[in-house]
């Protein structure tokens, strides 16, 4: 029907996007001339942007760091324009924040002090969940585990920056693996199963009191499956 055809035309053709977006971004990047707005974005986001662009340039691509800064600049610019449009229509956007970060990522690469590591900078433990009726060996997620004592000493600065940035992008934030803030399951690094893991205390309400003190009352959804 014509109605169905109209709906189809409004949908994103992700296959075509995947095939062409990097090529078009590179073309746009080489034509781009940094302006004051771009320079302000780089300055305002220097606490994460420099590490991210260096990481992406060295590990994921042969493109220069400035290319990835350019991509982030336009993503944020377009995303916030979309968010304002939605908010003006009375629509709130819900984001999703993972509890852990990846071993192969900027946080672990540049900030080993945030995690439980040995003298060589390797994880001593990783995250997961214990054996249960659904998985007799448990689950080994292989994410580095936070050194919560360090985070507490810094008044959770890294977490405050992370959450603040996400609440700039979203109106409501779903916190994945919410129980990890209370207790998290810690598994020896290198173990293939979760059999020899154990529960450890997370930051609890201390982190959220610090969050409220810094950012005020915020809309949070607590994931309740684990």
Label each region the model flagged.
Residues 24-226:
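Active-site and adjacent substrate-binding regions of carbohydrate-active enzymes
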Residues 1-2, 105:
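Short linear Ser/Thr-Pro motifs
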Residues 2-8:
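Short, small-residue-biased leader/transition segments that mark boundaries at the very start
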């Amino acid at each position: 029907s014509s109605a169905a055809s109209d709906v189809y035309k409004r949908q994103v053709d992700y296959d075509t996007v995947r095939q062409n977006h990097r090529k078009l971004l590179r073309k746009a990047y080489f034509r781009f001339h940094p302006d004051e707005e771009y320079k302000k974005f780089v300055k305002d986001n220097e606490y994460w942007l420099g590490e991210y662009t260096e990481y992406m340039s060295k590990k994921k691509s042969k493109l220069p760091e400035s290319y990835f800064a350019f991509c982030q600049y336009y993503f944020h610019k377009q995303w916030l324009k979309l968010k304002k449009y939605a908010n003006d229509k009375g629509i709130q956007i819900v984001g999703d924040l993972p509890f852990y970060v990846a071993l192969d990522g900027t946080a672990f690469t540049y900030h080993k002090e945030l995690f439980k590591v040995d003298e060589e900078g390797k994880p001593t433990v990783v995250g997961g969940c214990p054996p249960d009726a659904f998985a007799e060996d448990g689950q080994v997620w292989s994410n580095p585990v936070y050194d919560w004592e360090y985070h507490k000493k810094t008044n959770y600065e890294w977490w405050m920056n992370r959450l603040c940035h996400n609440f700039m992008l979203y109106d409501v934030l779903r916190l994945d693996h919410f129980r990890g803030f209370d207790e998290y399951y810690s598994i020896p690094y290198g173990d293939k199963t979760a059999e020899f893991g154990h529960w450890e205390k997370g930051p609890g309400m201390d982190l959220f009191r610090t969050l409220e003190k810094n950012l005020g009352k915020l809309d949070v959804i607590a994931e309740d499956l684990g």
